[in-house]
């Protein structure tokens, strides 16, 4: 649950008043602008994902797999784990549904500021739109080994209880997020690899049903 909510893969009006850093390197500014333009143009997106959870106190890695569907219009997201367990998180406007083992909970995000902010940044992290949210993150972007890598650190203290750093890896050609890495204060790390990414495809409305 915690990983699904923080993805993000990402998330914030809050109590802190720390300023965010504004990039001054022209190359960094252009990378952020290019990613934001691409993310803003995405009408819909669907993909498979593999999530690897590394706990600081254990050597074993927990690997799970699932599917994700996103639609920009109406702010809709479907995040579903398929193995080794089943869990579904659906965001549709101001409503969130969480379903596990046949039990379903529905939350109205309009009455829960933190949940609303987390859900919004979760979507923006998956598409890359979070890079321009200067009130939320200290952001650095660089080109490295044929990839674009963005490092985001939350500036508001209530977000740091979920993660201390987010790293997003982008395919420079498509300007799409292909990897999300979440680092927690405890030393735990979650890596999400997005695969078989398809954009601007028709997605059945059933995936966004909240009931």
Tell where the protein language model's regions lie, with residue ranges:
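Short, mixed charged/polar active-site loops
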Residues: 60-65, 86-88, 104-106, 163-165, ...
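Solvent-exposed coil/turn segments that connect beta secondary-structure elements
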Residues: 50-52, 73-75, 82-85, 94-96, ...
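Gly/Pro-enriched, hydrophobic low-complexity segments
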Residues: 107, 130-211
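Acidic/charged, solvent-exposed loop-and-adjacent secondary-structure segments enriched in E/D, K/R, S/T
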Residues: 98-124
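Bacterial N-terminal signal peptides
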Residues: 5-14
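N-terminal mature ectodomain segment of secretory-pathway/periplasmic proteins
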Residues: 40-93, 98
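Boundary at the C-terminal end of the N-terminal hydrophobic targeting segment
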Residues: 18-22
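General beta-strand recognition
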Residues: 46, 76-78, 88-90, 95-97, ...
């Amino acid at each position: 649950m915690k990983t699904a909510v923080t993805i993000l893969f990402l998330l914030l009006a809050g109590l802190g008043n720390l300023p965010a850093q504004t990039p001054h390197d022209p190359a960094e500014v252009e990378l952020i602008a290019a990613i934001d333009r691409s993310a803003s143009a995405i009408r819909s997106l669907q993909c498979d994902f593999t999530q690897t959870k590394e706990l600081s106190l254990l050597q074993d890695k927990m690997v799970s797999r699932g599917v994700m569907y996103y639609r920009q219009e109406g702010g809709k997201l479907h995040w579903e784990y398929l193995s080794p367990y089943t869990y579904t998180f659906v965001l549709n406007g101001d409503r969130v549904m969480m379903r596990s083992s046949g039990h379903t909970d529905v939350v109205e995000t309009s009455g829960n500021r933190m949940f609303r902010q987390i859900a919004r940044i979760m979507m923006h992290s998956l598409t890359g739109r979070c890079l321009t949210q200067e009130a939320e993150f200290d952001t650095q972007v660089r080109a490295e080994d044929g990839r674009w890598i963005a490092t985001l650190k939350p500036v508001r203290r209530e977000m740091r209880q979920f993660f201390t750093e987010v790293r997003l890896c982008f395919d420079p050609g498509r300007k799409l997020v292909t990897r999300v890495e979440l680092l927690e204060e405890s030393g735990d790390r979650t890596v999400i690899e997005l695969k078989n990414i398809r954009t601007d495809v028709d997605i059945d409305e059933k995936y966004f049903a909240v009931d």
